[in-house]
Amino acid sequence: MSDMFRKSVLNKLPHLPPTRAPWADESEPIEEIDEEDEQLDGIGEFKPATMGPSKHDTQDYSPLSASTFFAQAAEVQPPSTPCTFRVYLTPPNLSIASANAGTPPGPSGLRTQQQTNRHGTYLVCHHGGGASGLGFAPLAREVKAKGNGEMGVLAFDCRGHGKTSTSDPNLELDLSHDTLLSDFMAIIEMMFPDPKESPSLILLGHSMGAAPVVSAAPELQKKGYTIPGVVVLDVVEGTAVESLPLMKSVLSKRPESFRSVIDAIYWHVTSNSIRNVESARVSVPHIIVPAPSSSSSDPSANPGGKQVWRTNLVGTEPYWEGWYKGLSQRFLRTKCARLLVLAGQERLDRELMVGQMQGKFQLEVMSDVGHYLHEDNPAGLAATLITFWHRNTRVLVLPPKIGAPGPGARGGPVEVKQVGQQ
């Protein structure tokens, strides 16, 4: 594995003492490092767990309620799965969508019209491994604000994460690609049982979540759902597969526990795991759980005390490769608009590079964000998503030619071809 690649992977991780990677800037002071120390188990260390914010730190690290960001929360139990999923959603404002169906003509006399589904449009979000649906909370608020409420947002905690529960604990860590896909399809079909009466669905997946989302798009289209676009956040198959040997080492550097929820939020912010304090305050409490007390095996028996990770990511190792193998090919084959959003100058693999040169998908690169780009800069991502949605669900109404028949004859909107469609 080249130093350049390792640097691209580790740039997503916190750069904090006491350990610094051997390829760091030579102008900065650094202790002598033997070649034998440059092994995988010695790179990319996280900041160790701390005693929490100091008395002089005026920043508020207390947890925030999801109600500030989402309009509703629900428990969804599809009959085909052993899980009861926690779902968060903000429905679209259909009255606003209808009122904004057309736009006034510009200087050229051209007019655009929104291809509105009378049931609205939802952005459906699938989080990555170890995260939760509330990682999309600030994004949901920004999408509502920047889209004038026309686009709804739905996010959920996938199996083995957040507030989702599983009837058989042995199935909590079954996070294979097929299981994630089956769960995702079951939630969609439970929330929107009739494809003809369903809103349009723009599917978004972050990291691990990209795998089921990309695979679900054609399956949902076969069932009659309208899927205007698919969005993938910060994952490239080639880079992801190459980085898998690093993952166990990276996970082993995380603290095993925290003294409290506030300490966990503080660690995520100060380690640069999440660079947005507000987002950390709403998302972090849902990726940790109270540690079992010495007298009870029930994690809820110790509320407010020592906290441990909700999801055993190391236990999902058998499924890691399955999340990413074939992802680029499936992404490029989806019959809808495609958007790939990356954090920093991540390199594309061969298939995506060729696809990008052929104009098969839209590529956006966000700066000054980490791997959790939707948490670090929700406003910037929301603006990109709203533009992507409008671009791929609008028609161009051309003015009639001189001497041409009036409206109703040969006139009418000319549909703009969607990005990435053949």
Swiss-Prot record:
Q: Which UniProt keywords apply?
A: Hydrolase, Serine esterase
Role summary:
Demethylates proteins that have been reversibly carboxymethylated. Demethylates the phosphatase PP2A catalytic subunit.
Q: What Enzyme Commission number does this protein have?
A: 3.1.1.89
Report which superkingdom the organism of origin falls in. Answer: Eukaryota
**Which residues does the Swiss-Prot or TrEMBL record annotate as the active site?**
207, 234, 371
Name of encoding gene = PPE1
Region named Disordered: 1-27
What is the source species? Cryptococcus neoformans var. neoformans serotype D (strain JEC21 / ATCC MYA-565)
The family note in this entry says: Belongs to the AB hydrolase superfamily.
| Reaction(s) this enzyme catalyzes, per UniProt | [phosphatase 2A protein]-C-terminal L-leucine methyl ester + H2O = [phosphatase 2A protein]-C-terminal L-leucine + methanol + H(+)
Record-given protein name = Protein phosphatase methylesterase 1
**UniProt lineage:** Eukaryota, Fungi, Dikarya, Basidiomycota, Agaricomycotina
Pfam families, per database record: Abhydrolase_6
Q: Which enzyme class, named as a word?
A: hydrolase
Quote one Gene Ontology molecular function term: protein C-terminal methylesterase activity
